Amino acid sequence: MPELPEVETTLRGLLPYLTNQLIYSLTLRRRTLRWDIPSHIESRLPGHRITTVCRRAKYLLIDTNAGGSLIIHLGMSGTLRLLAPETPLRPHDHVDIMLNNRRVLRFNDPRRFGCLLWQEDGQIHPLLQRLGCEPLSDSFNGDYLYQCSRARNVSVKTFLMDQRIVVGVGNIYAAESLFRAGISPLCEADKISLQRYRRLAEVVKDILLYAINRGGTTLRDFLSPDGRPGYFKQELFVYGRQQQPCKQCGSLLRQTTIRQRTTVWCGHCQG
């Protein structure tokens, strides 16, 4: 599933080409993804402009002057690409937004776990109402994590992936952050010191920013809007490397399951 760096990479690729563009048409080839796509957007959006594009957690918000914003989530396998209008359709090309710069924004989602929803101006969609802190913001720091973790009797990996605490950190970046901070993913969240949480917050920010600069992590489905893969996969220390030698100490990496998620860590470096 695309995590924050992949969504941020998509945002940065789209923003220069979508801002202030007039929407000529919107074509829905499928009416339902994870949830029903609001049918009114087909008639509501043409003739209006995209004012900006932003990100909240793993959601992309395409703001318009039509009185609201499109909310897009890429789900497990979704991609957004900017294409020439004559580009042949591929299987699972569900949505086209035709723009006045002779480009079409095409949403492809083979597994259909993504979504395309609508948020009226002045309202906050229910999906966005309980989201936690943005990890690249100034408010995300070790003190914040420490305070949120008190009386939280869950593993630190589960805690770090809780979107009500911090958004956009999924299995890949939680595993990598905990490794580089030297914290076992099995450690209980409320047993970790303030000093170690401060280190963890720094590492999370550093890894996310580095992954964004590397175009995200392409494991199977993710491509940036220009069709290029992300290259952070080459930098992974633990994720997906179970039973391989630790790049740092040479010990065999361990594997377990935490909340139905495969978790890989180094028993020596994260002891």
From Swiss-Prot:
Catalytic activities: Hydrolysis of DNA containing ring-opened 7-methylguanine residues, releasing 2,6-diamino-4-hydroxy-5-(N-methyl)formamidopyrimidine; 2'-deoxyribonucleotide-(2'-deoxyribose 5'-phosphate)-2'-deoxyribonucleotide-DNA = a 3'-end 2'-deoxyribonucleotide-(2,3-dehydro-2,3-deoxyribose 5'-phosphate)-DNA + a 5'-end 5'-phospho-2'-deoxyribonucleoside-DNA + H(+)
Enzyme Commission (EC) number: 3.2.2.23, 4.2.99.18
FPG-type zinc finger span: 237-271
Cofactors named for this entry: Zn(2+)
SMART domains: Fapy_DNA_glyco, H2TH
Highest taxon listed in the record's lineage: Bacteria
UniProt: DNA binding residues: 92, 111, 152
GO biological-process terms attached to the record: base-excision repair
UniProt KW keywords: DNA damage, DNA repair, DNA-binding, Glycosidase, Hydrolase, Lyase, Metal-binding, Multifunctional enzyme, Zinc, Zinc-finger
Keyword match DNA damage: yes
GO molecular function: 8-oxo-7,8-dihydroguanine DNA N-glycosylase activity; class I DNA-(apurinic or apyrimidinic site) endonuclease activity; damaged DNA binding; zinc ion binding
Active-site residue list: 2 (schiff-base intermediate with dna), 3 (proton donor), 58 (proton donor), 261 (proton donor)
Entry-linked Pfam families: Fapy_DNA_glyco, H2TH
Subunit structure and binding partners: Monomer.
Function as written in the Swiss-Prot or TrEMBL entry: Involved in base excision repair of DNA damaged by oxidation or by mutagenic agents. Acts as a DNA glycosylase that recognizes and removes damaged bases. Has a preference for oxidized purines, such as 7,8-dihydro-8-oxoguanine (8-oxoG). Has AP (apurinic/apyrimidinic) lyase activity and introduces nicks in the DNA strand. Cleaves the DNA backbone by beta-delta elimination to generate a single-strand break at the site of the removed base with both 3'- and 5'-phosphates.
Family: Belongs to the FPG family.
Protein name as annotated: Formamidopyrimidine-DNA glycosylase
GN (gene name): mutM1
